[in-house]
Amino acid sequence: MALPGDPRRLCRLVQEGRLRDLQEELAVARGCRGPAGDTLLHCAARHGRQDILAYLVEAWSMDIEATNRDYKRPLHEAASMGHRDCVRYLLGRGAVVDSLKKADWTPLMMACTRKNLDVIQDLVEHGANPLLKNKDGWNSFHIASREGHPVILRYLLTVCPDAWKTESNIRRTPLHTAAMHGCLEAVQVLLERCHYEPDCRDNCGVTPFMDAIQCGHVSIAKLLLEQHKACSSAADSMGAQALHRAAVTGQDEAIRFLVCGLGIDVDVRAKSSQLTALHYAAKEGQTNTVQTLLSLGADINSTDERNRSVLHLACAGQHVACTRLLLQSGLKDSEDLTGTLAQQLTRSVDILQDFDHDVKS
């Protein structure tokens, strides 16, 4: 049996809302910190036990600004879990509204990871600053864009109209983030209320349209084309277009949309490497995507600037199924600029056997 004052037992009593049992335990031994450095206040706030929270503060004078090993305070816990009564109690007791946890997250940032407008409003009305950024350069609006709740985005823009004018440390905007995560309604709000450049780029030259395509969010890609005049053939810093990025991630529907719907050349090459979408798909072992590209007319014999065939990249990646498909589709082994055959790049017995079978047949 756990001894009185055992931190795990005390936390369990708080979690289960057993105030009377907790009072008896604390009369014997004042609570210790838990294994993560949590106080009982952290535990009460995390689990929404406002009555216990009040008891610990008022009867035991526990410090509402106590931090755990991640520098979280009870307000962080209550805000992140959406426990409005605990948030309001702590704010009413004078808790610091913009306290920082590890990685410089404020309670408002943590609240924006949940779709709980009331908690966000309470924090803002008590002075929380939506413009503060965490260590990655994200402010609360940016975090809310990832979650994609349009009501919260509209509220933050109402109380802080410039909240959208933000970039992360790698120059990604909330529009990039909402597009990548497939948050269609959020993207609609951002296009209606904010003023992002049509093809704003991050440090890698990636646009929101590319993000939408490479993650398979075709409806968002269409919206960006129609309402934001995005460029479907824009290239990133490596010269790769949306088609190439979709091939990497195996987004076949997006590839069909680009080629059949927008007329993008299925064999368009990345400027720096002269790789085609077929090369990118083979490099990643995206067998279904290789099949899709071939069905759309991709040139199976295309080579890059080093005269590497699609087979070279499939073999270098040790992709058995992809290599087999290419051989079955009629692609023959050939030398690159260094005189290396594709089969020389593989360690796979299965792939080498496929080459032997191809030669014999």
Curated annotation (Swiss-Prot):
Pfam family, one: Ank_2
ANK repeat start-end pairs: 36-66, 70-99, 103-132, 136-165, 170-200, 204-233, 238-268, 273-302, 306-335
Keywords, alphabetical: ANK repeat, Cytoplasm, Nucleus, Repeat
Site, Required to capture Ser that is misactivated by AARS/AlaRS: residue positions: 102, 135, 165
Effect of residue 102 to R: In ANKRD16(3XR); abolished ability to enhance hydrolysis of Ser-mischarged tRNA(Ala)
Cross-referenced SUPFAM superfamilies: Ankyrin repeat
Gene disruption: observed consequences: No visible phenotype. Loss of Ankrd16 in mice with a 'sticky' phenotype (mice homozygous for the variant 'Glu-734' in Aars/AlaRS) results in early embryonic lethality. Conditional deletion in postnatal Purkinje cells in mice with a 'sticky' phenotype exacerbates the 'sticky' phenotype and causes widespread protein aggregation and neuron loss.
CC annotations in GO: cytoplasm; nucleus
Superkingdom of the source species: Eukaryota
Chief location bin: cytoplasm
Cellular compartment(s): Cytoplasm; Nucleus
Result of altering residue 135 to R: In ANKRD16(3XR); abolished ability to enhance hydrolysis of Ser-mischarged tRNA(Ala)
InterPro entries from the UniProt entry: Ankyrin_rpt, Ankyrin_rpt-contain_sf
UniProt keyword Nucleus present: yes
Domain remarks in the Swiss-Prot or TrEMBL record: Side chains of Lys-102, Lys-135 and Lys-165 capture Ser that is misactivated by AARS/AlaRS.
Function comment: Required to prevent the misactivation of serine (Ser) with tRNA(Ala) by promoting the hydrolysis of Ser-mischarged tRNA(Ala), thereby playing a role in translational fidelity. Binds directly to the catalytic domain of AARS/AlaRS and captures Ser that is misactivated by AARS/AlaRS, preventing the charging of Ser adenylates to tRNA(Ala) and precluding Ser misincorporation in nascent peptides.
Subunit structure: Interacts with AARS; the interaction is direct.
Protein name: Ankyrin repeat domain-containing protein 16
Species name: Mus musculus (Mouse)
Gene: Ankrd16
